[in-house]
């Protein structure tokens, strides 16, 4: 199959898609790339505004023939077109059918679960890497845990991560959360091992992996912990990584568990966070969402340049080995996490699948429905100049 395009950015007219376009143009080192979406006029505008000389491909997310023409020519498809459960399923299916690697920025694990069930075996047999969640959801959690594990050189019993960040609210994430609230996903949302293969965890590991985290003082990092709004997305990805690594005989540890929290400087801040998280949950599952939704950022909108520039994320990891030793690692990133950091990360993931595929984890023939850590290793973080976790 003659693939004459290295990377296609699908959803290039959206806010995050346009950031990916700008970033890829800034680091372009001779690759062939294109922009794609469903609206020719908007794609033309993106090309004009960014002074691009790249191919424009029109392909609606429901047009299987157009998607097929796109994926037959593309080595890697980078998608920012969410909510992904609405707009992404046929694109992923086309990537698997036509042997194109794929990355995106979804946090919709219930959708990823469906992809695993439908496409993992075929993608694995073809050596095609389908890697969702390559943005702020869930690379800091996933690659932070992965890299910390390489530094302790011992089987890991437990990792707890603690997150703080500053940035604008992601309109796409909010739209996804509102749409998920009406899908009746209770059992799936509560399954802490939703993305894991069957029989890849014990009941004891399940019991130690509850989403019901409260407020606690963490002496190791001199801070308070509380619920983190993205933990339900990130934790499932990290646990799938652990299972996929175990299949390659590279497991974190047979007793490995992972939980995720928000990081707070004071007990009072943690209390406020707890009640805010509860309030968000109530809004999403009740008619209150119809009152709040008109005031939320709309898909396609995003934060100002100032907010993007001054944002950051700060993740701390407490790593406990099976022999009881504890270490603390820290991972930092500059820029608004939901947009600037996310656009850089997912673009570097796509570039890794073009430039470094022969040296990526698992070997050149490895494939399936993967995670950033199991499918890419440390490569995306090192290229974006984010700070890899260092021992605190």
What positions do the PLM features span?
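N-terminal Rossmann NAD(P)H-binding glycine-rich loop of SDR-like oxidoreductase domains
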Residues: 9-23
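Active-site-lining helix/loop region of Rossmann-like oxidoreductase modules
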Residues: 10, 150-315
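Conserved glycine-rich Rossmann-like NAD(P)H-binding loop of the short-chain dehydrogenase/reductase
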Residues: 30-39
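Rossmann-fold cofactor-recognition segment
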Residues: 50-62
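Conserved Rossmann-fold cofactor-binding substructure of NAD(P)-dependent oxidoreductases
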Residues: 59-73
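Glycine-/Pro-rich loop/turn segments that contact NAD(P) or position catalytic residues
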Residues: 84-191
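C-terminal active-site/capping subdomain that shapes the small-molecule cofactor and substrate pocket
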Residues: 252, 264-382
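Conserved small/polar residues in nucleotide/adenosyl-binding loops
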Residues: 384-390
